[in-house]
């Protein structure tokens, strides 16, 4: 698919999918692709989409396990899917440049936004559905500051399976540097953990924040640098679906 400049589904495949939908029967779109594509039409018209990338010779067995409910899906996107090709390039860890519009907002005068779609992606980095549901609660940090030389913090949050199926959830830790000597991304993935939960079960998930998680590569110094200052620890089920944010300071 990387040989095509068009990121939407080819017309012949779209016509076939549209014809299947018009039968009135339930349809699941199994989407093979080696890169993010524009799936806005599919998202609006297809009841369910299973993105399988290029899974190899045994992918059919894995796909059947998911479709027939033998396995609860738990995958998360490792790339951002745009609403429109005109949004590209698009990354979850973008810089806070221009006059940015707050996440979830559609349009506001004198802000850096489009007039035909929101700034948000169709499917954000880290996104993924499950046959069950999860609740996050009680995010905490082990301290409100850490030492630059040898300190570290732990971020913890409680995850509960509020649905009816055994399932895995991937808890994601992002870091935001509030003010730096260079422009830093609005958030950067610095850790994640998969947790398996039975229906009604809850577990405390703990993730470590160390100096490396707060560092960036300084081109002038040719080394990794962690600058003292204020940060935010952000835990979510994706880069967009934030479940908790706690500030802390690097001293």
Task: Mark where each language-model region is.
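Hydrophobic helix-and-loop "lid/oligomerization" segment in the mid-to-C-terminal part
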Residues: 1-45
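Short, surface-exposed ligand- or partner-binding patches at beta-edge/loop junctions that are enriched
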Residues: 208-237
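Secreted, periplasmic, or luminal enzymes acting at the cell surface/secretory milieu
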Residues: 32-168, 174, 228, 232-236, ...
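Feature representing long, continuous alpha-helical segments
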Residues: 7, 11-19, 61, 65, ...
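Intrinsically disordered, low-complexity Pro/Gly/Ser/Thr-rich segments with frequent PxxP/GP/PP motifs
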Residues: 181-219
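Intrinsic-disorder/low-complexity, polar/charged segments enriched in Ser/Thr/Lys/Arg/Asp/Glu/Gln
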Residues: 152-154, 202-206, 243-245
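Short acidic, flexible loop segments centered on an aromatic residue
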Residues: 164-181, 187-189
């Amino acid at each position: 698919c990387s040989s095509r400049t068009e990121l939407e589904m080819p017309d012949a495949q779209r016509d076939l999918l549209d014809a299947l939908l018009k039968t009135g029967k339930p349809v699941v779109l199994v989407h093979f692709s080696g890169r993010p594509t524009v799936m806005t039409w599919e998202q609006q018209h297809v009841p369910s989409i299973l993105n399988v990338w290029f899974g190899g010779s045994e992918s059919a067995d894995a796909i059947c396990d998911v479709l027939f409910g033998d396995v609860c899906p738990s995958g998360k996107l490792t790339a951002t899917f745009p609403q429109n090709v005109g949004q590209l390039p698009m990354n979850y860890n973008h810089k806070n440049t221009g006059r940015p519009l707050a996440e979830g907002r559609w349009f506001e005068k004198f802000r850096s936004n489009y007039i035909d779609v929101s700034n948000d992606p169709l499917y954000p980095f880290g996104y993924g559905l499950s046959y069950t549901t999860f609740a996050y609660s009680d995010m905490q940090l082990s301290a409100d500051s850490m030492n630059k030389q040898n300190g570290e913090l732990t971020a913890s949050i409680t995850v509960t399976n509020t649905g009816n199926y055994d399932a895995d959830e991937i808890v994601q830790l992002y870091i935001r540097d509030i003010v730096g000597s260079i422009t830093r991304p609005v958030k950067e993935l610095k850790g994640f953990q998969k947790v398996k939960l039975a229906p009604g079960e809850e577990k405390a998930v703990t993730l470590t924040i160390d100096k490396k998680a707060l560092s960036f590569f300084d081109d002038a110094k040719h080394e990794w640098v962690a600058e003292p200052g204020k940060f935010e620890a952000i835990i979510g089920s994706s880069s967009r679906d934030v479940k908790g944010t706690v500030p802390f300071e690097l001293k």
